[in-house]
């Protein structure tokens, strides 16, 4: 984590009086979440001076999609007015771009492997087209694109080039232009979990995932933050599960940071304990704990839940 960029990010947040928490686990390795911002919806922030890894992006995507929010990667690699879309709900911005996001300014340009596009508000496009009496064919002819392209625009399956955006503004006005981040949040799309065969059969985490899935629970595995799993039941209640590791001090740190993450993402934290010493300590601290040889109790807890906010 770049100290220079993180200080810029913190200055921006404190200037706007946002509340936030720093996630300080793992301490000496790469991690996927540096800051959780408590805005209207919790926002995850990863600060990086270089490229983020696939595993970091994977964690950010899973947490963001499961919590119906955004993950922002703040890096000097991005241009001020352009967002880079890394995955569903994961967006990379420059420190200047991050300031615009926090100030509520609209950022409508984004970059993908296919080029630079402008975000449009598909529902406004359809409403205005129908209100003004244009057929799909009329708009397609005016823009110089296919009828299928207009269908895709109106369904939100495709955005537009700079040239097409200018023509749309001429026809329908500039309120048709959207915000790359907040108009792109996806919540209903399922994030497909890795195949269980990708994990080591000797791994406790792998066995746990298998048992949870066997009981009809939806599981997402995290690799570079304080929580090990995101678990959702059929009623969409959300849990963060974290597992004790071999080092006592690191485990205590991990649990503390996972508690912060669960609080800001409105999830319930469940801790799996592997030693008797840790069990007593965690119970004294008020953590909800389960022993590794008593996973059925954890499953009963999750499947028996109802009415909790997700």
UniProtKB/Swiss-Prot annotation:
<dbReference type="InterPro" id="IPR020886">
    <property type="entry name" value="Arc_TR_HTH"/>
</dbReference>
<keyword id="KW-0805">Transcription regulation</keyword>
<keyword id="KW-0804">Transcription</keyword>
<dbReference type="InterPro" id="IPR001387">
    <property type="entry name" value="Cro/C1-type_HTH"/>
</dbReference>
<dbReference type="GO" id="GO:0003700">
    <property type="term" value="F:DNA-binding transcription factor activity"/>
</dbReference>
<dbReference type="Pfam" id="PF01381">
    <property type="entry name" value="HTH_3"/>
</dbReference>
<feature type="domain" description="HTH cro/C1-type">
    <location>
        <begin position="125"/>
        <end position="180"/>
    </location>
</feature>
<feature type="DNA-binding region" description="H-T-H motif">
    <location>
        <begin position="136"/>
        <end position="155"/>
    </location>
</feature>
<protein>
    <recommendedName>
        <fullName>Putative HTH-type transcriptional regulatory protein YG5714_1269</fullName>
    </recommendedName>
</protein>
<dbReference type="GO" id="GO:0003677">
    <property type="term" value="F:DNA binding"/>
</dbReference>
<keyword id="KW-0238">DNA-binding</keyword>
<dbReference type="InterPro" id="IPR010982">
    <property type="entry name" value="Lambda_DNA-bd_dom_sf"/>
</dbReference>
